[in-house]
Amino acid sequence: MSTILTTENLSLFYGKKEALKGINIDFDDKGITALIGPSGCGKSTFLRCLNRMNDLIPNVTITGEVNFNGHNIYAPTTDTVQLRKEIGMVFQQPNPFPFSIYENVIYGLRLAGVHDKERLDAAVEKSLKQAAIWDEVKDRLHANALSLSGGQQQRVCIARVLAVEPDIILLDEATSALDPISSRMIEETLLNLRQDYTIITVTHNMQQASRISDRTAFFLNGELIEVNDTKQIFMNPVKQETNDYISGRFG
C-alpha cells in the first residue's frame, strides 16, 4: 500500500517545553489509524501538526518535516488554506456554524469560489449521504444546524469536511462528547469512509480504537512508542509501555 503522509523527526515546543520528541511515522493511503495514549501524551498536538493547526497557537516552535504527497507542508510556499482543504479536521465538540445545514455543508465550497447551484446541491447530497445523515435531514436542509442533536451536528461537521473532497480526515476525539448511540453511528460512518479516505483519529476509547482502526499508534510523554497493525498492538504489543497502557496499568 502506498504512503500518503510521513513525518520525519517531528518535534514541537511550547516555549522551551518539548511536547513532541522526534516523531517518525508513515500513514497509508486509505484506511484508519488510531492515535492512543494517556492525557497529555501529545497525540492531539501531533494530530494538529498534520494540517498546521498549531500555527494558530502563540509561542510554538516546530522542527522536522511533515510530507504530504511528497511535499513538506511546513515549507514557506505552502498554502495553508489549500492544505486544510486537502487535510480536513473534525473536532471534539461539534462545531456547526449558526446557519442552515445546507450552508454549513457548502461553506468550504463557497470559500473556494463555487457558486453553481447544481454543483452545490449535488455536493450537499453526496456529503450528507457519506456522513450517514442525509435521510434524517433531507427534508429540512434549510433548518439551523444548531437545532440538531449533538450526534447529528457532528455528522454535519463530517459532511462539511467531505464536501471539499479532502484526501485525509483528522478527528480529534470526535465522539467523546457524544452519547453511545451517536458514537456508534460516527464509528459506522468512519468504517464506510475508510475505503476512500485516509482517516487519522485521536481517541481515549480503547474499544473504539480496536473496533474501527487498521493501525494504531501509541504515544507516551511526547514520544511515539509503538505503531503497528491494530490487532498486533492490542494482542501482542512489542513494547512494555504499550502493554501496560493497553492492560490498564496506567492512563
UniProtKB/Swiss-Prot annotation:
From the UniProt record, list the reaction(s) this protein catalyses.
Answer: phosphate(out) + ATP + H2O = ADP + 2 phosphate(in) + H(+)
Q: Which UniProt keywords apply?
A: ATP-binding, Cell membrane, Membrane, Nucleotide-binding, Phosphate transport, Translocase, Transport
Q: What is its EC number?
A: 7.3.2.1
Q: What are the GO cellular component annotations?
A: plasma membrane
By its UniProt entry, which InterPro entries does this protein fall under? AAA+_ATPase (IPR003593), ABC_transporter-like_ATP-bd (IPR003439), ABC_transporter-like_CS (IPR017871), P-loop_NTPase (IPR027417), PstB-like (IPR005670)
Recorded superkingdom: Bacteria
Annotated Gene Ontology MF terms? ATP binding; ATP hydrolysis activity; ATPase-coupled phosphate ion transmembrane transporter activity
Q: Where is the signal peptide?
A: none
Tell me which Gene3D superfamilies the record gives. P-loop containing nucleotide triphosphate hydrolases
What is the protein name for this chain? Phosphate import ATP-binding protein PstB 2
- What is the name of the gene encoding this protein? pstB2
